[in-house]
């Protein structure tokens, strides 16, 4: 823009122009210092626009009417301060009762299964046609049902995510690598058929139950209700119940494990590949209560992760994946010195046990090798006899059995198990054997420990079908036959799934306030439920994050740097903790800074602790209103009323006939006394009735506006809405539903803007943090819907005005077209106070840029329409930088410990590709051919094999991997209403004015565009990956957060029969060696 001084200068002669140019050059970047944007003019524009837009928002939302109606009832309401400790104790009690019901259902299954097995006599010739979950309803080319594939009636059931199920019968899944008619499986399926009536009875007693099942130690999986299983594209169902966490956790006790891997020269080629896969399968069987390390040996010892020399680490998913990456780097050479490795393994287990950090329960050494030249009895005598508390599990790799006897003896002499793994296809089944050995003490003790898993995603649904987080309660099933008691035979594990949303139903969201929430963690500090848990990421379609089930509380409540809250909850304490928090909203782009009070206690009967967070201020208060049922029912009948679908006003799960009811329908039936079996929250319903009565007049108000066509002639305002603290909503459309610009708004798919189990709507939460009487304006960030950003949402909070306490009782708002909103802005910016009508400055001038930004720095209006929704710092970096320096805005650093970052990885066709059963089979076939050629022609093909099987393709593949990031958010300083500034750039001075829009969260920014100031970089909100150097990575690996061990431990039992150790057939030749532990015992007394 050209100012009056400049125009004056322009009229002078050539000499004056030259003098001015020389002066500008002398001043450097302090130029155009007289060219200021008039603050008074910008103030006028801001005032005009603010008044106009508030008038529209207040008028169409009906905010003043609603505030007036609540004010009229103010004398009839009681305001109470929420007692957080009493609240969390009551919620924990509710959850205990729910968990107890689920545990009892599982206990009934255990009793029925053990009784059925006790009565059954094994019949090797038993022929029994059972319902095979893969084959049911399948026909051959002649139209006849396949064997094991009889007709099995299936019908969609909304209680089971609308999957087709049979609620009268269970069916059986058998892993692809097992024979459907194996006598052991047929007998097991036959006697477990008696579980059907218990499944049905459990479901009748507790209709909120979902999947119930029995996972057999033989490998089959009986599931109720029956459902058809579909193979993958290769015709394979890789699911093996024995490899699931609920099975392993229930079957065994926590354990410390050292895995020894032979990497001597004889292990080259396929043997090393099988060894790696064996290690990987062992890692799959380890859970969060276990600890491990991997040591390779030849002439020397090599820790797979050198940083963890001489210690063990928790077997969480992150650590296991870290070790898997190192497995790919193993290579074979030299000779194997097993004695050194065994000495090291025993010392590591002993030293780690003394730290008190491990499982303090079972201990084991897993030995993976192609042979042993000695029995190393002196080492076992030194470290392990006579107690034999460290079990030895030996895995002989390859078909040769020359050194098998020594390995068998080691396992049998140390209460372990020996297996031989000849091909990749053998790995899974052989690895599983050790779990049944570790289960023996528990079986002999006959201790039916109840176990609960961490949260995981329902495997019956694809990730893009919806998020169903759940936990499983499971119990082991034992053989009760007296003759097998000392053998400790585990029959399997029974369990049932508990959706996390069931836990959330026990939580009265209306008592937690607008920003309040409940959360629960496991004994390891991992999140069971928390509104900030984000298990999925999007890349084309929704996918599970690799480590979603082991997100620690400290990774979402990261402001608690000393883990005070986390550690208190892990240790099952009851108490209170307070801290300032930075809660992100609106897809993480905005931040609310507040102080939270946390209340916590333990949940008895489960390894979980419960917490409640209440935000200070209005979040700590609750009020009770009172109206008659007749009044309330009348106003609930209005068609514009809806209730939060995910809130539990009435329990519609207790009786099947109630499942089809919406919460609003259930309340109406309950109040009318038509459904005496309905159980409802009387206190919440009373407040719903109150809100319905108080907000009822707004329906007529909106209707009158809609009928007056001249009021909204250009149809700029499209929707008016309100929500109350009880989850009650009212909506009014000023245009036809098909004409709405944003078709998703206030619909179930727009999770951010509706009441759900985790949070209040975004427009409600943001309005609550605004100054009472002002509106918060925002545009939705793009989420793939083309026209979604073409609207502006305005909302304001309604408060019960009281001298001391002012709880937010409701929020109202409107949604209008962005074009309508922007037109109002440009109209206001053309006004000026000049009497002659000639404005000194205008947003139409080429020398200025005008913006409308919100309190988080996002652009709502710009002359360049494509900048709408962008962060102001990316467009005007120099101005934003100056605003930060001046204190008009402040930068807040945030952290995301659940992020996914792009990483370049060398793709490999070696070990990981062999997880596929068919690839495993082909690899095994290739190995056999290689061995045959070696035998016939004595020609060394190892180098050919090795290069073909384990060489990595020389190409980089970009993948998304879990990472930690930090990123900024920006918040305006409320006390600063207006600011002017000049920025010294390289060859010019850039002036700007920022002016707050009255009664809003908006700011008008007018910037001198003639000075580009390109030397100042844009300010971006892009997250930056936090990269840890090697020493810090090592420290993070070693660091172990406080955890609580499971209360039960069954590490060993004196009556255990250790003779079944996988090597009984050849023990006779080694009787003398087997007597060594006994001799050692005698001499040690």
Curated annotation (Swiss-Prot):
Keywords: Calcium, Calcium channel, Calcium transport, Disulfide bond, Glycoprotein, Ion channel, Ion transport, Membrane, Metal-binding, Phosphoprotein, Signal, Transmembrane, Transmembrane helix, Transport, Voltage-gated channel. GO terms for cellular component: GABA-ergic synapse; presynaptic active zone membrane; voltage-gated calcium channel complex. CDD domains: PDC2_MCP_like, vWA_VGCC_like. Residues 1-33 form the signal peptide. Its main location: membrane. Residues 452-543 form the Cache domain. The modification Phosphotyrosine is found at residue 918. It is a single-pass type I membrane protein. This is Voltage-dependent calcium channel subunit alpha-2/delta-3. It comes from Rattus norvegicus.
């Amino acid at each position: 823009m050209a100012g009056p001084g400049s125009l004056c200068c322009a009229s002078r002669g050539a000499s004056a122009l030259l003098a001015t140019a020389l002066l500008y050059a002398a001043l450097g970047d302090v130029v155009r210092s007289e060219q200021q944007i008039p603050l008074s003019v910008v103030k006028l524009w801001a005032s005009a626009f603010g008044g106009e837009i508030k008038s529209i928002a207040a008028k169409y939302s009906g905010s003043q009417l609603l505030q007036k109606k609540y004010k009229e009832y103010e004398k009839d309401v009681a305001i109470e301060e929420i007692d957080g400790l009493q609240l969390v104790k009551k919620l924990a009690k509710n959850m205990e009762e729910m968990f107890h019901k689920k545990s009892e259902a599982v206990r009934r299954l255990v009793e029925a299964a053990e009784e059925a097995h006790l009565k059954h006599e094994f019949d090797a010739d038993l022929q029994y046609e059972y319902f095979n979950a893969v084959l049911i309803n399948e026909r051959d080319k002649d139209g006849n049902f396949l064997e094991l594939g009889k007709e099995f009636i299936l019908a969609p059931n909304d209680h089971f995510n609308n999957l087709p199920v049979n609620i009268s019968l269970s069916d059986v899944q058998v892993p692809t690598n097992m024979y459907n008619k194996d006598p052991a499986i047929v007998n097991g399926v036959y006697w477990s058929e008696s579980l059907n009536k218990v499944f049905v009875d459990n479901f009748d007693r507790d209709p909120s139950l979902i999947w119930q099942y029995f996972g057999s130690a033989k490998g089959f999986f009986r599931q109720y209700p029956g459902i058809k299983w579909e193979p993958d594209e290769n015709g394979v169902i890789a699911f093996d119940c024995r490899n699931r966490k609920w099975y392993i956790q229930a079957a065994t006790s926590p354990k410390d494990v050292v895995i020894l891997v032979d990497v001597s020269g004889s292990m080259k080629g396929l043997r090393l590949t099988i060894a790696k896969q064996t290690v990987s399968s062992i890692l799959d069987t380890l859970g969060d209560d276990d600890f491990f390390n991997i040591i390779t040996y030849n002439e020397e010892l090599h820790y797979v992760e050198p940083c963890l020399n001489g210690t063990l680490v928790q077997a969480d998913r992150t650590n296991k994946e870290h070790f898997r990456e190192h497995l790919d780097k193993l290579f074979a050479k030299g000779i194997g010195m097993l004695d050194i490795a065994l000495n090291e393994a025993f010392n590591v287990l002993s030293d780690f046990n003394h730290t008190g950090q491990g499982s303090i329960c079972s201990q084991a050494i897993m030995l993976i090798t192609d042979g042993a030249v000695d029995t190393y009895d002196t080492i076992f005598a030194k470290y392990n006899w006579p107690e034999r508390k460290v079990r030895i599990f030996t895995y002989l790799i390859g078909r040769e059995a020359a050194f098998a006897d020594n390995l068998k003896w080691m396992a049998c002499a140390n209460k372990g198990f020996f297996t031989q793994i000849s091909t990749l296809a053998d790995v899974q089944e052989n690895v599983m054997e050790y779990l049944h050995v570790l289960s023996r003490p528990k079986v002999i003790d006959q201790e039916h420990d109840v176990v609960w898993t961490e949260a995981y995603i329902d495997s019956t649904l694809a990730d893009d079908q919806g998020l169903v987080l759940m936990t499983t309660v499971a119990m082991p099933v034992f053989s009760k036959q007296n003759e097998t008691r000392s053998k400790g035979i585990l029959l399997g594990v029974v369990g049932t799934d508990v959706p996390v949303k069931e836990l959330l139903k026990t939580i009265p969201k209306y008592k937690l306030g607008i920003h309040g929430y409940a959360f629960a963690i496991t004994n390891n500090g991992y999140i069971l439920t928390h509104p900030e848990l984000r298990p999925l990421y999007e890349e084309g379609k929704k996918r599970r994050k690799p480590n979603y089930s082991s997100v620690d509380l400290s990774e979402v409540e990261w402001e608690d740097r000393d883990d005070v809250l986390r550690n208190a909850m892990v240790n099952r304490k009851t108490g209170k903790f307070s801290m300032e928090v930075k809660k992100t909203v609106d897809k993480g782009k905005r931040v609310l800074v507040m102080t939270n009070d946390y209340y916590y206690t333990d949940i008895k009967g489960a390894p979980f602790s419960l917490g409640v967070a209440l935000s200070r201020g209005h979040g700590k208060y609750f009020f009770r209103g009172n109206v008659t049922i007749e009044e309330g029912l009348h106003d609930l009948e209005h068609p514009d009323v809806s209730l939060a679908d995910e809130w539990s006003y009435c329990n519609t799960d207790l009786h099947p006939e109630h499942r089809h009811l919406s919460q609003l329908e259930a309340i109406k039936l309950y109040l009318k006394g038509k459904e005496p079996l309905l159980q409802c929250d009387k206190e919440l319903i009373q407040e719903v009735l109150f809100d319905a009565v108080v907000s009822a007049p707004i329906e007529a108000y909106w209707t009158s506006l809609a009928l007056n066509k001249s009021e909204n002639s250009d149809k700029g305002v499209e929707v008016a809405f309100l929500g109350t603290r009880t989850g009650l909503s009212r909506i009014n459309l000023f245009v036809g539903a098909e004409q709405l610009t944003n078709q998703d708004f206030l619909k179930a798919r727009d999770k951010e803007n509706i009441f759900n189990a985790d949070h209040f709507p975004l427009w409600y939460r943001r309005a609550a943090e605004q100054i009472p009487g002002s509106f918060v304006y925002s545009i939705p960030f793009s989420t793939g819907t083309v026209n979604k950003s073409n609207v502006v949402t305005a909302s304001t909070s309604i408060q019960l005005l009281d001298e001391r306490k002012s709880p937010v009782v409701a929020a109202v708002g409107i949604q209008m077209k962005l074009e309508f909103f922007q037109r109002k802005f440009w109209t206001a910016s053309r006004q000026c106070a000049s009497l002659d009508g000639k404005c000194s400055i205008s947003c139409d001038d080429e020398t200025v840029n005008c913006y409308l930004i919100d309190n988080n720095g996002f652009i709502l209006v710009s002359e360049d329409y494509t900048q709408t929704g962008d962060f102001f710092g990316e467009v005007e970096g120099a101005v934003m930088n100056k605003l930060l320096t001046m204190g008009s805005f402040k930068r807040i650093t945030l952290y995301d410990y659940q992020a996914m970052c792009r990483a370049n990885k060398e793709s490999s066709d070696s070990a990981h590709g062999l997880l596929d059963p068919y690839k495993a089979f082909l690899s095994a076939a290739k190995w056999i051919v290689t061995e045959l050629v070696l035998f016939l022609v004595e020609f060394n093909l190892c180098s050919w094999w090795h290069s073909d099987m384990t060489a990595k393709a020389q190409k980089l593949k970009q993948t998304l991997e879990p990472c930690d990031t930090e990123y900024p958010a920006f918040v305006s300083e409320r006390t600063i209403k207006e600011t002017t500034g000049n920025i010294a750039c390289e060859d010019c001075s850039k002036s700007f004015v920022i002016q707050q829009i009255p009664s809003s969260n908006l700011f008008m920014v007018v910037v001198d565009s003639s000075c580009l100031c390109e030397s100042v970089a844009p300010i971006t909100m892009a997250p930056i990956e936090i990269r840890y150097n090697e020493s810090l990575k090592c420290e993070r690996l070693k660091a172990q957060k406080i955890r609580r061990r499971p209360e039960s431990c069954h590490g060993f039992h004196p009556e255990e029969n250790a003779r079944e150790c996988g090597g009984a057939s050849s023990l006779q030749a080694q009787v003398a060696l087997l007597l060594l532990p006994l001799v050692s015992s005698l001499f040690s007394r």
